[in-house]
Design a protein with these regions (language model features):
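Acidic, glycine-rich low-complexity/disordered segments
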Residues: 1-91, 109-112, 168
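Gram-negative/organellar outer-membrane beta-barrel architecture
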Residues: 63-175
Length: 175
């Protein structure tokens, strides 16, 4: 019952009998059934991909743990600066009486460039450059390009990480 609220309580004190009788009133509201996911984002995230992360099906009864699980799955990607997951207001019900879950996403900067210089007695001098691109394919992916130039060890590489690949909780990493 997502719309439960506490109504005013009533407390009766009987000084002669030394008793206190509190009466709590709670309005449970109606039973809430969930619709799909509505994504609010200015970024590149594919709304269908986000909907695939939802642990409920259309028509399932509202469970706050399932809504929190969707938020956790999005947080685990590490691609977003801000994530908000909430049940839509009562006035946004569908004709069937279902309520969508609203997901608002704020993307990180698409590109991050890192550079560094090192020196050690074992490897000598070196320069590192790393470029990371986030959410290039609209599914919270991370592409990392790395180059290292040093006296002894030089290398170039790329890593691609696709979180929740084909099903939630599974990440595909290619390098």
């Amino acid at each position: 019952y997502a719309d439960a609220k506490a109504d005013p309580r009533r407390v009766v004190v009987d000084n002669a009998a030394y008793t206190v009788a509190p009466e709590y009133r709670i309005d449970s509201g109606g039973l809430v059934r969930l619709d799909g996911v509505r994504v609010l984002s200015r970024g590149r995230t594919n709304p269908e991909w986000v909907a695939g992360l939802a642990p409920w099906k259309e028509g399932d009864r509202y469970d706050p743990d399932q809504v929190a699980e969707l938020e956790r799955r999005l947080l685990d990607t590490g691609v977003y600066d801000g994530i908000g997951v909430s049940l839509s207001p009562v006035d946004q019900k569908t004709a069937e009486g279902l309520r969508p879950v609203i997901v608002s996403l704020q993307d990180r900067p698409r590109r991050v460039l890192e550079a560094g210089a090192t020196w050690s007695t074992a490897d000598g001098a070196g320069v590192d450059v790393i470029q990371t691109r986030y959410n290039r394919f609209g599914r919270a992916d991370t592409l990392r390009l790395e180059a290292r130039l040093a006296d002894i060890d030089s290398r170039i590489g790329a890593d691609l990480s696709l979180p929740h690949w084909r099903r939630p909780g599974r990440t595909l990493k290619l390098g």
